[in-house]
């Protein structure tokens, strides 16, 4: 079987986990005027990629994928606890939990997930997206690095979809932004791979504040 199919499946917006429902604070940034043009959108996404995802979210997800691939279940359990503790706002916690639950339901109904992974998932009190993404990669025989690349691409694609719904930003402009941001996506993956686990962490105050403000936003399209 062509291995690219599994990777495309994992990164597909058709994966039924509801990623299109969340903006991760971007809708609030548009509402308060911080993001109001392609240039400001590029700055917002670039900062999220290099200052937050590359330093924390991406290496944490990569560690989940590696532990699942190597069957290091105790390590994976510790990573799950770290992930849950790192959700700084109610919306970010619910986003990870709800998307994780949807992916868990999908995996439970598929034959590819092996018994050790099923057992781990069954005894996990609160499966989140990073865990279920790692188990999906294991089930579909996707390497940890490729699983990380798929996750980064899905994140970028979703952010651009949010912009097309909230800004005067058409599909061609979104594709131009994609071309400009792809080198940063590659840099984020490389940084996430090289980072020392002891230095894992970011201080994304702007993201946290945007997500907290989004909880009280009067009119909104997205759940975060």
Curated annotation (Swiss-Prot):
First-listed, main subcellular location of the protein, grouped into a coarse class: cytoplasm
Entry's Gene Ontology molecular function annotations: nickel cation binding
Annotated GO CC locations: cytoplasm
Function field: Required for maturation of urease via the functional incorporation of the urease nickel metallocenter.
Subunit structure: UreD, UreF and UreG form a complex that acts as a GTP-hydrolysis-dependent molecular chaperone, activating the urease apoprotein by helping to assemble the nickel containing metallocenter of UreC. The UreE protein probably delivers the nickel.
Compartments where located: Cytoplasm
A Pfam family matched in the record: UreF
Protein name, as recorded: Urease accessory protein UreF
Organism of origin: Pseudomonas fluorescens (strain Pf0-1)
Superkingdom per UniProt: Bacteria
Family label: Belongs to the UreF family.
Keywords (A to Z) from UniProt: Chaperone, Cytoplasm, Nickel insertion
Keyword Cytoplasm: yes
